[in-house]
């Protein structure tokens, strides 16, 4: 029996029952989301320490901050691509971002229970990644200039940072939704997302720190204690992505699945339009 949707008889009971049911049967996807963002933050921390800490020989070997930022962008873009196309990423959908999950909730592809647990997992996993880095590297990671890879508004100020975050989130989600309508296009979503991440880090980071992700920014703020401008990173990415969703709906666009890369050999817990997606089995 497939996992019951929000309007099925199995979910006509209490809201609490639907949340318990989701947790019982979808916890592997939640664990994947937590692990995915945790790994992403660890890779980000290692890259930034190696390339930006003054004591690093690699940082000294690349004196240009623009070039160092480009190298970090390539590394993090590649990490995003690897996450999306990994077996685990193909199962959970590789959201790794509460703003992405919220957008697919708005589009009717994710249930409220799954959206809540995805977001909790993403915040928890991101924090676990940075706290682990803090435990291993100590002040090298948590103090300036690294500050646990905190996202901070650039010299133009917080309003510019807010606008930049809305813009990059809007562009990224517009690309995802444009590719989402067919399996043929969706297979390239990960490559395009990774390319955008690399470009954003290389060119947009001086404006806002390039967050795109509320969980990612909170994860950095926890061990560093740097919370300046956190309101930007909690609000701008969801606003940008939700605006992209509204435009997508207004244009009559189709949303096939909440996965960034649908793969029919992996089960799909979402409201999925692709034929052959393995359904979640649910016990009575």
Predicted regions: what is each one?
Residues 1-284:
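Membrane-interface helix-loop junctions and terminal tails of multi-pass membrane proteins
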